[in-house]
From Swiss-Prot:
PANTHER family: 50S/60S RIBOSOMAL PROTEIN L14/L23, LARGE RIBOSOMAL SUBUNIT PROTEIN UL14M. Belongs to the universal ribosomal protein uL14 family. GO terms for molecular function: large ribosomal subunit rRNA binding; structural constituent of ribosome. GO terms for cellular component: cytosolic large ribosomal subunit. This is Large ribosomal subunit protein uL14.
C-alpha cells in the first residue's frame, strides 16, 4: 500500500534511485495505491548522467510492494521493497532495462512492454 509521501526505489536504468509519491492517480477518493497502479512521483536522488534529474516530477508504475497481493488461486506474493518504474507522458518506460522480477498481474493491466523488459515474471 503506497500513499502520499512514501519513499520508493526505482527498478529501471532511467538514472533515478529514489522517488517520493506525491499523488495517487485514479479518482477523488483514491488515496492508497497498490500493485499495478500509476502514481505521480518526485525524483529525490539520481545518478549524474541519468535521463532524469533530481527534483523532476513524472509518473511511475508500482511493480513491487511489501504489502503483497492475493491471487485468485489463494497464493500471496510479497516483495522485500517498494519499487517503481518511471513512465513518460505516453505511458512507456523511461529506461531500457528493468531490474528484478515483476508479477504477472501487470500483463492483465496492459503493461506488456514492462513485462517484456523484466528479468523474470512471477
Amino acid at each position: 500500500m503506497i500513499q502520499m509521501q512514501t519513499i520508493l526505489n526505482v527498478a529501471d536504468n532511467s538514472g533515478a534511485k529514489e522517488v517520493m509519491c506525491i499523488k495517487v492517480l485514479g479518482g477523488t477518493h483514491h488515496m492508497i495505491a497498490h500493485l499495478g497502479d500509476v502514481i505521480v512521483v518526485s525524483i529525490k536522488s539520481s545518478i549524474p548522467k541519468g535521463k532524469v534529474k533530481k527534483g523532476e516530477v513524472c509518473k511511475a508504475l508500482i511493480i513491487r510492494t511489501k504489502c503483497g497481493v492475493t491471487r485468485h488461486d489463494g497464493s500471496n506474493i510479497k516483495f522485500d521493497s517498494n519499487d517503481v518504474v518511471l513512465l513518460n507522458k505516453q505511458g512507456e518506460p523511461f529506461g531500457t532495462r528493468i531490474f528484478g522480477s515483476v508479477p504477472r498481474e501487470l500483463r492483465v493491466k496492459n503493461f506488456s512492454k514492462i513485462v517484456s523488459l523484466a528479468e523474470e515474471v512471477l
